[in-house]
Amino acid sequence: MITTVTFNPSLDYYVTVDNFRPGATNRTTSELLLPGGKGVNVSTVLSRLGIPNRAVYFSAGFVGEEITRLLSDEGIETVPIRVEKGVSRLNMKLRSASGSALENGFLSEAAEDTEINGMGPDIPPEKIEELMQLLSKLEDGDTLVLGGTIPGALPATIYRDILERVSGRKLRVVVDATKSLLLDTLDCHPFLIKPNHHELAEIFDFEPDPKTVEGRDEIIHYMMSLQNKGAQNVLCSMGADGAILLTDTWEVFIAPVFQGKVISAVGSGDSMVAGFLAGLDEKKDMEYALRLGSAAGSAGAFSRGLADGETIRKLAGV
């Protein structure tokens, strides 16, 4: 069984507004309400690919209840840990029909979406212990996915704390997190880590250039550095330039680049993780897993929200 953990899930409210004007009354022309957060996204795409999984997440207020309802509708086994105070994050993703960043008072075509993200609730220590107790029941051979940011009140070592707590189990651990959260887990030897090339550059202070052979070689060099620090397999996503997988047997696979119109890259990296895990579940073949993962990430970028399983498999040709 695959279990995902999301500390700060969200309800993402996508709206489109014609000719957005700050300080004025604007009316939406389209709306979409989706659950969000790295682990939640991984669970959603796994379910759409037909892979049973369990989503564990902290839930507060009416927003948390709606997140649970939407995930249940996807066929996901939900395990919300209820927090009594506060409310789960409500995020607004604003796009103008003509684009998305301000230019002369309007949103220009070339810019990115405007996002306003909520804070989320504070998680008390007893709720962290409840999470630990849940994870201690995982069985040998299970997969545990840790991803995303954590609320500011939690210790920066929380991912490492979890891995130390479950160290007696033979789990397949996946970590998709930024700099310190990721680095702190490496000597626990996670099965897979998934930085993108920008996060890799932040860790090692270099300028990534995935478009050239020399640039990719440099990216692979730093992926090997993460492997030397303890990661078993390293998957580096590079946006429109595909992805690179470095396996625990020192094999390097380059993901195919799929063509399409990018609508929103939100959740693409999470989709890649889900597709990769689905591929491993189906064939236990790294190259196949990378292809399905790359297709899932691309299909997500070509969609408003996360892609459905049929679209992903058609793009992957599997």
Please state what every model-predicted region is.
Residues 44, 90-94, 242-246:
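Short beta-strand scaffold segments in enzyme catalytic cores
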Residues 2, 52-54, 78-79, 173, ...:
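Hydrophobic anchor at the start of a short beta-strand
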Residues 1-56, 64-66:
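Glycine-rich phosphate/adenosyl-contacting loop at the front of the ribokinase-like
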Residues 213-318:
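Conserved phosphate-binding/catalytic region of the ribokinase-like
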Residues 156-249:
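Conserved phosphate/ATP/ADP-binding segment of small-molecule kinases
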Residues 48-142, 314-318:
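Conserved N-terminal subdomain of the carbohydrate kinase-like
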Residues 47, 167, 281:
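Gly/Ala-rich phosphate-binding loop of Rossmann-like dinucleotide-binding domains
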Residues 115-117, 141-148, 176, 196-197:
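Short beta-strands and strand-loop turn motifs
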